[in-house]
């Protein structure tokens, strides 16, 4: 197994597949991602879901061994950053979200183990919030890395207030809230294109993975409130890019990922696929049945869950709120 190189994990915010052109939405909200379908480095996934509809519970599971399907104690679960550190990766956490606040603590704990940290939106929840657009993150991406690096980039993405997320309006229709959300999705697509351009130029680039923490329901103004759960809050994008040399070194991994493009997957399992992609072996606890790049992957629509194990994905089709 090829190990090492530079890998990038981009975490989106509040982006639902329902408003993404690349997933069939009628507006041109994701022109870059749509074009990427022609890029041989790109592997798109159709059926990704959030494990929860709020950032901290969602990312606490996503970035650690803990998931909806195991009975692991969260306090004992390793995080992807801790494991990457031990495996000899230089770790970076670059964020446009605040570091400390009532809601950010477990995610901040994970981020705090990264060797290099850049927080572009201040430290504390009660400090003056800066409405920095996500392009502020671009200059923070290292221009050269050690031989092995894991760069995690946490976007503000499509978080409400949507109008604060992008510089210039693009869409105008009958619903100003939806227009603003679609503008945020379109700007997010631009940001992803710029991140990809930068990291792809790194001499040792191997792969980039993008997923959103959870979705959003702007149409009903429900945002991502778990107590008013609707399926757009759970439907998220997942896409991966792997360099030609990674694909040449790891053809089986690529073949297995491609065979799972239509598979059902929840983002509490990003940890498992990242461990595989990073080439990390010999951990005390591994779950190949939850690894999207494994032949043993066994999550299906029938056994997949969201809202931390309280809602079954199998119920999506019968839900009144599509």
Predicted regions and their residues:
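Active-site-proximal alpha/beta segments of enzymes that process anionic O-linked groups
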Residues: 1-9, 14-169, 266-267, 272-298
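Histidine-centered active-site microenvironments of extracellular/periplasmic hydrolases
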Residues: 24-28, 204-205, 211-251, 286-288, ...
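A short beta-strand-to-alpha-helix junction
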Residues: 71-78, 174-186, 226-234, 247-274, ...
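Short beta-strand segments
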Residues: 93-95, 150-157, 182-185, 207-212, ...
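Active-site-proximal cap/lid insertion segments
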Residues: 100-105, 155-202, 227-237, 244-246, ...
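Marks the mature luminal ectodomains of secretory-pathway proteins
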Residues: 189-193, 197, 241, 271-275, ...
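Polar, surface-exposed loop/tail segments
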Residues: 254-259, 278-315
């Amino acid at each position: 197994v090829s190990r090492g190189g530079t890998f990038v994990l981009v975490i989106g915010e509040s982006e639902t597949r329902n408003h993404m052109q690349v997933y069939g939405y009628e507006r041109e909200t994701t022109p870059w991602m749509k074009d990427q379908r022609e890029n041989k480095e790109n592997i798109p996934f159709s059926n990704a879901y959030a494990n929860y509809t709020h950032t901290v519970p969602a990312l606490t599971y996503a970035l650690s061994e803990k998931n909806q399907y195991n009975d692991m104690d969260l306090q004992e679960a390793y995080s992807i950053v801790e494991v990457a550190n031990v495996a000899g990766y230089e770790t970076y956490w670059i964020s446009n979200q605040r570091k400390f606040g009532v809601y950010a603590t477990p995610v901040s704990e994970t981020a705090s183990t990264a060797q290099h940290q850049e927080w572009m939106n201040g430290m504390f929840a009660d400090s003056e919030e800066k409405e920095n657009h996500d392009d502020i993150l671009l200059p923070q991406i290292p221009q050269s890395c050690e031989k092995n690096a894991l760069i995690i980039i946490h976007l503000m993405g499509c978080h409400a207030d949507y109008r604060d997320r992008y510089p210039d309006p693009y869409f105008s229709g009958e619903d100003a809230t939806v227009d603003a959300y679609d503008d945020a999705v379109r700007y997010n697509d631009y940001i992803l294109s710029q991140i990809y351009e930068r990291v792809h130029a790194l001499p040792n680039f191997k792969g980039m993975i993008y997923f959103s923490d959870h979705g959003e329901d702007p149409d009903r103004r429900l945002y991502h409130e778990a107590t008013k759960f609707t399926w757009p809050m759970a439907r998220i994008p997942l896409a991966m890019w792997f360099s030609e040399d990674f694909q040449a070194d790891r053809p089986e991994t690529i073949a297995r990922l491609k065979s799972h493009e239509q598979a059902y997957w929840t983002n509490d399992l990003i940890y498992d696929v990242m461990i595989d992609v990073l080439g990390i072996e010999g951990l005390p606890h591994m779950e190949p049945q939850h690894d999207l790049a494994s032949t043993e992957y066994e999550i299906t629509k029938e056994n997949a869950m969201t809202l931390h194990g309280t809602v079954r994905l199998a119920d999506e089709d019968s839900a009144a709120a599509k």
